[in-house]
């Protein structure tokens, strides 16, 4: 998992 508040770009395709 790599998606949390402050790092939404982490879960972008």
Curated annotation (Swiss-Prot):
Signal peptide bounds: none
Q: Which GO terms describe its cellular component?
A: extracellular region
Distribution of this protein across tissues and organs: Expressed by the venom duct.
Location in the cell reads: Secreted
Grouped into one coarse class, the protein's main location is secreted
Q: What keywords are annotated for this sequence in UniProt?
A: Disulfide bond, Neurotoxin, Secreted, Toxin
Q: Does the keyword Nucleotide-binding apply?
A: no
Under the GO molecular function aspect, what terms does this record hold? toxin activity
UniProt PTM comment: Contains 2 disulfide bonds that can be either 'C1-C3, C2-C4' or 'C1-C4, C2-C3', since these disulfide connectivities have been observed for conotoxins with cysteine framework V (for examples, see AC P0DQQ7 and AC P81755).
- What task does this protein carry out? May act as a neurotoxin.
| UniProt note: domains | The cysteine framework is V (CC-CC).
UniProt record similarity statement: Belongs to the conotoxin T superfamily.
Protein name, UniProt field: Conotoxin Fi5a
């Amino acid at each position: 998992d790599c998606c949390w508040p402050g790092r939404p770009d982490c879960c972008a395709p």
